[in-house]
């Protein structure tokens, strides 16, 4: 039977109106399970009516499968159906079925269909676990019931619960691997990510395949799930379902990822609003991550318990370990089921015991459940018990296993229960464009990085840091500083300062020596300082090093801050750390250590002479004649030698000693010492906009500037040095890039044509949806001779060129530029001079012009 245009329009409109009614009802009551159930029923009614109209009701069975078969149809999900044909199948049925499927699309349903006979269903299910799973959630919608019942009986008889369990658990492991990583943290998939809806489906699929029930209440009745666990899992499931319904309704398409574009809108649908401490989207993501964490925890408890029900009882191979614990089939188990109720101190001892027995693969199923329920024993009395405090500290003092232990404690909610302030930051996302992990994950990543420095198997990664930490007495203070450095995030205010009190109280409560208490608290308060100085100040200026040395005071504090700084930067995002930052930090460390070794004082005259002598030695290695550098050096003052390393001084003298006064710009480039990027030297008669033209050139050619030192010689020549990073996906070799820069940049600097800024360029999706408010500050430097211009803005191609153009327009001289890019966030610092900065009205106009240039 063929429907005319009028009935088609009727069905299309009826379905659209029903969808709208259900969506409106959902927005009013926010009841996701009810929406899913009602939408499934509405589609049932539509399909059944059309099935009958096509004359198929008595000839073939129509069944709902997959999520639709489960009665959980999301707004824009596919409607998965099975059409069960008789065998043999008359030709007219095939024609009707084809027309029926076309009708589904015509009225606005996205159909996922399979058309099979009973034997074909059995054969396909036997060979493909995905099809077997799809048919497991199978509900008759229309047509004769007996063929469908026969299919259900034969599928059940054919099913192997053991093989199904192994297949689905392997599938889950592979899915977790695919969806684990940076992109998943920022835009998690509500269905597929670890702790997502699919993890809940996996539990119920396995349970149903084993005949143990297909819902949470059934698992409670079977003793597989407790009432408390069922309440938690239902709540988390509903949270995830609500998020997914909201995503579909807002996107108007099947969108299962919490993408940047929609996070703020979903947060508004949840009634969340920005606060001074947290964006609404950050609050939303914390709700998601906590729900996912609960699912992850319970999935880890329930799957081992289901395994025990499905498999034939494996003989228990036990080995005595302690009063409370024994090894059970290669896992740590409890000797009594209520051990944590009787002896709460055994909770932390369980983690310490597993840490000391790396041959054990984890906690046995009974132990996992006992730990889960034992969390409630961790209260103020538990936290103040000296025995528990000693056990917690011993975990940090063990020679191995700290990272795994802390991650286990976090996974099962023990760490946040023992340290309530840590519990507050669990699942907290940071939309600052460079942290890609939740705060708790970032903290544990930092501790992991510190531990990795200390493990001999990884000495090759950071040899110097490995030597440093292995010479560090009582390294547990470093791990505690890592644990507390960001613990005050999200409270509002400066988290570094707020965290000092938490760290100090913990250390004193846990019996650390006064010296160590002070060190941990100091590290928490100063954990951003070394990174900021290295990337925003001139670390080759002895006075900068002197000030930093006065802050750190001792080699032990210097080493501790250096180790924590590297671990922290590497723990924010895989893309933030690079060898340029590594070099800056290591150079600052060594320079500061030299000052401390001399009693904290710098002899500027000796420092200058030492640099010149080192530069001379390098020139002689390149067969440059004695005193060849004298002509150039006569044009350079003390400031030049203070701001450049000996290697740079030697390079400049080597390439410029024969051309002190060229008429045209000279450009030389070389591979940087760290082999990450290029050093570019510009030597030219000084003129306005020279720095801006160089920045514009690098912006047009997609080279990103990390550092710039701008200097004018006594005889009026610009001697500028840039450190630039190579464009991503660049196919040419370094020699080609060097030749290109030396020729093209020299030509760009020589022209008298008006300055052409590079195109503004595309910004990242992350920055588009979480923009950074531009900030500009101008202050005198420590000598009151120049000014420090600090800028914070969202990074994009050509940003630095626009800043340089504004500075040129106001006739400001740039003496140095420190460029710090953290993900999509630019934090740039310039040392500048010029009359405009001494007039308050002009300085305000400059700030306004910069803000305009920084806006996206």
UniProtKB/Swiss-Prot annotation:
Region feature Uridylyltransferase, mapped onto this chain: 1-320
Pfam families: ACT, GlnD_UR_UTase, HD, NTP_transf_2
Domain ACT intervals: 679-760, 788-856
Cofactor(s) listed: Mg(2+)
UniProt record, GO biological process: regulation of nitrogen utilization
Gene3D superfamilies found in the cross-reference section: 3.30.70.260, Hypothetical protein af1432
Activity regulation summary: Uridylyltransferase (UTase) activity is inhibited by glutamine, while glutamine activates uridylyl-removing (UR) activity.
SMART domains: HDc (SM00471)
E.C. number: 2.7.7.59, 3.1.4.-
SUPFAM superfamilies: ACT-like, HD-domain/PDEase-like, Nucleotidyltransferase, Nucleotidyltransferase substrate binding subunit/domain
Record remark on domains: Has four distinct domains: an N-terminal nucleotidyltransferase (NT) domain responsible for UTase activity, a central HD domain that encodes UR activity, and two C-terminal ACT domains that seem to have a role in glutamine sensing.
Protein task: Modifies, by uridylylation and deuridylylation, the PII regulatory proteins (GlnB and homologs), in response to the nitrogen status of the cell that GlnD senses through the glutamine level. Under low glutamine levels, catalyzes the conversion of the PII proteins and UTP to PII-UMP and PPi, while under higher glutamine levels, GlnD hydrolyzes PII-UMP to PII and UMP (deuridylylation). Thus, controls uridylylation state and activity of the PII proteins, and plays an important role in the regulation of nitrogen assimilation and metabolism.
NCBIfam families: PRK03059.1, UTase_glnD
Protein name per its UniProtKB record: Bifunctional uridylyltransferase/uridylyl-removing enzyme
Species this protein is from: Chromobacterium violaceum (strain ATCC 12472 / DSM 30191 / JCM 1249 / CCUG 213 / NBRC 12614 / NCIMB 9131 / NCTC 9757 / MK)
């Amino acid at each position: 039977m063929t429907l005319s245009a009028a009935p088609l329009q009727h069905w299309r409109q009826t379905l659209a109106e029903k969808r709208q009614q259900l969506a409106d009802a959902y927005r009013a009551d926010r009841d996701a399970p009810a929406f899913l159930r009602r939408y499934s029923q509405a589609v049932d009614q539509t399909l059944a009516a059309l099935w009958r109209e096509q004359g198929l009701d008595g000839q073939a069975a129509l069944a709902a499968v997959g999520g639709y078969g489960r009665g959980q149809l999301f707004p824009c999900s596919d409607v998965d159906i099975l059409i069960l044909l008789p065998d043999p199948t008359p030709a007219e049925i095939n024609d009707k079925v084809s027309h029926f499927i076309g009708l589904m699309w015509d009225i606005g349903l996205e159909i996922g269909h399979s058309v099979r006979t009973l034997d074909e269903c059995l054969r396909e299910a036997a060979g493909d676990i995905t099809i077997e799973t799809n048919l497991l959630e199978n509900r008759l919608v229309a047509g004769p019931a007996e063929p469908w019942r026969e299919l259900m009986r034969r599928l059940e008889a054919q099913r192997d619960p053991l093989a199904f369990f192994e297949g689905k658990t392997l599938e889950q492991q592979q899915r977790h691997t695919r969806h684990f990583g940076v992109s998943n943290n920022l835009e998690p998939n509500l269905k597929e990510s670890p702790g997502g809806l699919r993890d809940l489906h996996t539990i119920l699929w396995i349970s149903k395949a084993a005949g143990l029930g297909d819902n949470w209440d059934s698992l409670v009745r079977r003793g597989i799930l407790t009432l408390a666990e069922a309440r938690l899992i239902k709540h988390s499931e509903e949270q995830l379902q609500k998020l997914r319904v909201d995503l579909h309704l807002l996107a108007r398409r099947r969108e299962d990822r919490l993408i940047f574009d929609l996070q703020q809108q979903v947060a508004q649908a949840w009634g969340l609003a920005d606060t001074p401490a947290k964006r609404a989207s950050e609050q939303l993501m914390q709700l998601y991550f906590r729900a996912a964490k609960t699912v992850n925890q319970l999935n880890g408890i329930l799957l081992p318990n289901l395994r025990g029900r499905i498999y034939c009882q494996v003989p228990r191979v036990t080995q005595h370990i302690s009063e409370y614990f024994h090894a059970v089939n290669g896992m740590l188990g409890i000797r009594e089921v209520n051990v944590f109720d009787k002896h709460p101190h055994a909770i932390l001892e369980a983690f310490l015991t597993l840490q000391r027995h790396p041959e054990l693969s984890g906690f046995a199923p009974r132990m996992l459940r006992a730990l889960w329920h034992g969390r409630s024993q961790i209260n103020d009395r538990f936290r103040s018990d000296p025995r528990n405090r000693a056990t917690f500290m011993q975990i940090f003092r063990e020679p191995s296993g700290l990272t795994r232990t802390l991650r286990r404690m976090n996974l099962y909610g023990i760490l946040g229960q023992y340290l309530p302030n840590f519990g507050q930051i669990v699942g907290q996302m940071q939309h600052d464009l460079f942290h890609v992990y939740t705060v708790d994950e970032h903290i544990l990543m930092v501790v992991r990085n510190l531990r990795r420095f200390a493990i001999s198997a990884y000495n090759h990664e950071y040899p110097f840091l490995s030597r440093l930490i292995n010479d560090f007495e009582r390294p547990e203070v470093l791990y505690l500083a890592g644990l507390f450095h960001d613990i005050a995030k999200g409270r509002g205010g400066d988290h570094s300062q707020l965290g000092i009190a938490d760290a100090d109280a913990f250390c004193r409560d846990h019996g650390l020596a006064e010296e160590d208490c002070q060190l941990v608290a100091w590290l928490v308060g100063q954990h951003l300082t070394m990174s900021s100085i290295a990337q925003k100040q001139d670390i080759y200026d002895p006075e900068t090093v002197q000030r930093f040395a006065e802050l750190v005071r001792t080699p032990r504090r210097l080493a501790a801050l250096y180790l924590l700084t590297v671990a922290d930067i590497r723990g924010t995002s895989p893309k933030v750390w690079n060898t340029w930052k590594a070099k800056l930090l290591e150079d600052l460390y060594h320079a500061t250590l030299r000052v401390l070794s001399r009693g904290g004082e710098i002899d500027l005259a000796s420092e200058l002479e030492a640099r010149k002598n080192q530069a001379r030695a390098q020139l002689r290695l390149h067969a440059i004649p004695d005193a060849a550098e004298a002509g150039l050096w006569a044009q350079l003052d003390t400031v030049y030698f203070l701001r450049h390393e000996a290697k740079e001084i030697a390079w400049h003298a080597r390439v410029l000693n024969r051309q002190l006064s060229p008429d045209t710009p000279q450009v030389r480039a070389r591979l940087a010492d760290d082999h990450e990027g290029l050093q570019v030297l510009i030597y030219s008669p000084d003129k306005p906009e020279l720095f801006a033209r160089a920045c514009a050139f690098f912006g047009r050619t997609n080279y990103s500037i990390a550092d710039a030192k701008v200097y004018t010689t006594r005889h009026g020549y610009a001697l500028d040095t840039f450190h630039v990073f190579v464009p991503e996906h660049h196919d040419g070799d370094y020699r080609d890039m060097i030749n290109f820069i030396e020729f093209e940049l020299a030509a760009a600097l020589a022209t008298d044509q008006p300055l052409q800024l590079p195109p503004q360029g595309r910004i990242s999706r992350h920055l588009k949806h979480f923009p950074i408010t531009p900030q500009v500050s101008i202050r005198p430097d420590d000598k009151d001779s120049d000014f420090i211009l600090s800028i914070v803005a969202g990074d994009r191609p050509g940003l630095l060129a626009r800043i340089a153009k504004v500075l040129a327009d106001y006739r400001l001289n740039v003496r140095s530029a420190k460029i710090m890019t953290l993900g999509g966030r630019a934090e740039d610092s310039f040392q500048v001079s010029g009359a405009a900065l001494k007039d308050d009205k002009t300085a305000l106009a400059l700030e306004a012009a910069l803000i305009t240039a920084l806006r996206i």
